[in-house]
Amino acid sequence: MSTLVFSHPSNDQLDAASSEDVRAVHFVGSLPATLTGDHHQMMRWFLDHTPDTTLTGLPCDQDPRWIIDWLDGLAAIDALEPVRTGHSADYNDMPTYRLKHGRWLESDDLSLGRATHTDAVMAARAQLHDDRDFPPHQVSIPNPYDLALFTFGSPGAAVTHLPVFRQAVLDDVHTIHRQHGNHVVFQLETPAVLATLDRTPRPLWPAAVRALAKQVARVFADGPRDATWRIHLCYGDLGHQPLFPLTDLVPAVQFLNALHEQLNRLRIPMPAVHIPMCTGTDAPPTDPRFYRALRHLRRDIDVIAGLVDETHPTESRTALALAETELDRPVLAVAAACGHGRRLVPDAVANAALACELAHRTAVC
């Protein structure tokens, strides 16, 4: 069984697929709660619902609510005390913490347990059988700044404590890469980037964009240099609701171009990027102006278009054509705006079916 990595596909790799397989399908990672628990069955679900279609990766996320289980678990960390309690039913109901006086955090306190989870997933993966080659296992890696921000509830505290969160994340990444090498790809996941820019006045964007890009670049620089990454930008999807309204793609493009510049300076390859183009409450826009910023995206950035919305299939088809017209090239892959963890099972099935249809759709550019 061979391993295919699509973060930086060559033309030969794309041509190796069937002539109609213009794009791959990308899954952000999570599945509805009723489908989680059994690693083998979760991975089988992704394979069974994408027949004759290339996948960018094979995920197996354990928390359908992304980091909520981890966030709740921080209540047991002795160095922390709650500032606000909550059940995470929505963004106003999330717990936050502060450091107890005279205490400090260790990276082990903040571990997401990704290394142990990945070992279990890879053991289950070895029992999978399919006629096609499997893509690499996709490991969900929340951005350290996001973890710090959700923990403390304020940007200032998040920046202050960022180093220990970064170390906790990278401990897992290095362990996983050492154990599994190129059989895994890492997906850095961040709603905080776009949420921060949404809350920042546009005259201050240049400084904010540089700071955010520098933070993300540091993660890649301190990780294994031969690891394969991709990036998942996000509007948030707790309760299938976004953190902020959909406006345009200018923030995403400005951040990604700044990150590209930082990584180029460090001689680190730019990962493929999942850009959300709809939300749990907003259909993919059909106004061409929404996608216009994509013409300014660096041409060597591979785009995963997060525009597959099973409740708006016509708009999804239109959005794909508009996005590729502005990019002047086919996207690497199509995807939903976020994971399927907040969907009902029939909706997840419908989304996967629409993604496969769009993946095989003839490119217009």
Regions found by a protein language model. Give the residues of each.
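Conserved, mostly hydrophobic/aromatic
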Residues: 169-170, 231, 273, 334
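Aromatic-lined glycan-binding groove of carbohydrate-active enzymes
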Residues: 213-301
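N-terminal basic, low-complexity leaders that serve as flexible interaction/assembly modules and, when applicable
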Residues: 1-92, 360-361
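Catalytic-face loop-and-helix region of soluble metabolic enzyme cores
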Residues: 261-365
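Acidic (Asp/Glu)-rich catalytic clusters
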Residues: 46-48, 87-89, 123-136, 177-181, ...
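Active-site-proximal, glycine-rich beta->alpha crossover segments in alpha/beta enzymes
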Residues: 89-179, 185-211
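Active-site-proximal loop/turn and secondary-structure-junction residues that shape catalytic pockets
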Residues: 143-147, 190-194, 235-239, 277-281, ...
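Acidic, His- and aromatic-enriched active-site or binding-groove loops in soluble protein domains
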Residues: 79-83, 156-174, 202-225, 249-261
